[in-house]
Amino acid sequence: MKIIRAIIYTVDLPTKGGGYRRTSGFSPDSNVSTIVQLDTDEGISGYGEVCPLGTHYGRGWGEASVSGANLLAKMIVGEDPMQIEKLNRLWDVKFKEDLYVKAPFDAALWDIAGKAAGRPVCHLLGGRYEGDIPMYRTVHLFKQHEDTPESWARRCQDYRAEGYQHFQLKGAATADATIATIEAVCDILAPGELALCDANGGWSFPDAVRIAAGVRNLPIIIEQPCRTMEECIEFRKRCWNPIKLDEVIETTQDLLRAWNAGAMDYCTIKISRVGGLSKARRMRDICVDLGIGAVPDDTWGSEFVSSALAHFAWSTPTKYRLNATDLTDYVTVVTADGYARGENGYLGFSDAPGLGLTPRMNVLGKPDYVVE
């Protein structure tokens, strides 16, 4: 089997309700997603997607993704799509850094492999593990005047009514306000529910220490308190709550450094940030071997990103799987049919071969690039 063609599309993904809030502020109301289609000489096509969240959040942005995808496509047309690890090593040599650009190509390879084998991608990633997968729900407050502890607690109760039991808060404007928000949400938690406070690396080290002291007796997981790994390692020494790291985990080396320093209890593995499903699987397996809780995740996207994420989550051993998410619930555009959406706070599953998706070509529109 050979890759004979790569087709690259871009789609704007407006956010439901407006800009998606992070501790550092608000993101754009819409983000550019890059969708890659790889065609083979045996008539099987695979799909993948990447959607960075603009220049304010992490490495990469939408316009860079599509330009990088055009360059990377030229390196793999003519190659055997079933040799996934070999292709990963090829583009790591020929295309340094910019891991997010590689993620949609890697997903497309797994999609092809699953379709060729007649198996869902999760089977190829290690197998589907038992048990339901709870989805965490990022709690949205779209207006600054809503930013009160009571509003955060009410929104958690709204999402509880939809079946969610895991609530992800965002840090408030000050350390005192963040402590008050965490207290208000923890006060309304029911048995079996879980709360996380995600700073997105936005807290200063002194504020992070103050917050940790203020919530040390509350059932809250602190997520990505500070911007750098060094700060997070030092923060761990001053925090009694469980810690989940996210933005500072980009490579296997980052994971091992954080573990060696005792800096985290849970590790978020965002597929696009680490360079695709292949690298994400490797990092997940290391987490399992080390006894660290894993959170299969991704930055943003539509059905293609969300399906890859779901298969990654289902192939993660139940004991080490904290939760996951369904990113289609945050955007207004549907790019493919066949996706098993989450319901009642739990992740969906499809046993269709590959990623199980049929693209909506009218949504994908005219290709930005075609490489043959």
Enumerate the language-model features and the residues they cover.
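Flexible C-terminal active-site loop/helix
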Residues: 2-4, 9-18, 33, 300-372
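Metal- or metallocofactor-binding catalytic centers and their adjacent structured scaffolds
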Residues: 5, 39-116
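Short Gly/Pro-enriched turn/cap motifs at secondary-structure boundaries
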Residues: 24-29, 97, 353
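Catalytic domains of carbohydrate-active enzymes, especially glycoside hydrolases
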Residues: 155-167
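Catalytic core of soluble alpha/beta enzymes
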Residues: 169-172, 176-307, 342
